[in-house]
């Protein structure tokens, strides 16, 4: 049997250790895993889904159900394997998000949203003792870093997709409406409002709050932020990331900075709470699998059973399975940083995500529309107003309805 997932080193280790335990219990089953970091992963899996040679069990992004199996053709309806996989362990809302084309195409591993993480070791060096709680705090941090630490130090760095999410967070906070209709993907914002959002991101770069993408690329090419020398050594002192990424970023810091890693506060940029929560990932069984019952048994082991759930812990986020969460907590396997971040996200976010927002043509590193938009801004190739046209054309091309 085969299984695939993406993630960082600690997630790879958890999956592999859990698989060893599963094989010890099921000696007639051998599991071959395939795994890597996120960069380029969706393109690889999309090709496998189209070719019909994807793994039996796949860790999937929520929007993949819409992108690759909107007709229910790629993934097994898990209601048909409820004898092997206990579907009663999940809340209806989380399960409903994975119900597409009249089919329970995956079970949610965890729910997630975005939050700020800060390296307070560097902030303290800049004379700042509290995490930023407002836009004014962010702008003041940019000024302090530049003046006290120098041009090479920044309060945070965000890649293009991260900038898009923060821009939407800002607009939702200011205007109190979802980015787009969560069912029809009809955009809820005007060109002027979006230009305002892009200008907000530009102001963070201009104010030395965020590193210019051109500067980042020249030093790191396409290296992920947590693997960059600037993050590891504390020159980049903040990120806006999924709550489940806490371990990946904290463990990457060198010894001089590790103790400074801190879960920040959600920032209100207007009268409303911005941001969304979503199914962070699911586990699905491909319709090309020849061992569907065994695949369902493996998923149940990883997410619902004591041995599996206590090993997986919070490596894929805070478990959405009620049984899995209890077993992980009892084993002390839920990382406090992830739990703290998730609790803050879930208490704050109220907006819904539409299924096209994470379309790979929009969010892909290096080639996506979001990348093009924010590259153009940082390279000075477009004004915010011009960048809006690029963004809307790209959104329309993947199926958004532009009002």
Locations of regions flagged by a protein language model:
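C-terminal capping/gating helix-and-loop segments adjacent to ligand/active sites or protein-protein/ligand interfaces
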Residues: 340-396
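Hinge/lid segment of periplasmic solute-binding proteins
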Residues: 61-113, 260-266, 335-336
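Extracytoplasmic/periplasmic substrate-recognition and gating elements
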Residues: 24, 32, 102, 126, ...
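Conserved N-terminal structural module of periplasmic/extracytoplasmic solute-binding proteins
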Residues: 1-72, 80-87, 130, 220-221, ...
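Mature extracytoplasmic/periplasmic domains
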Residues: 13, 74-75, 244-251, 281-364, ...
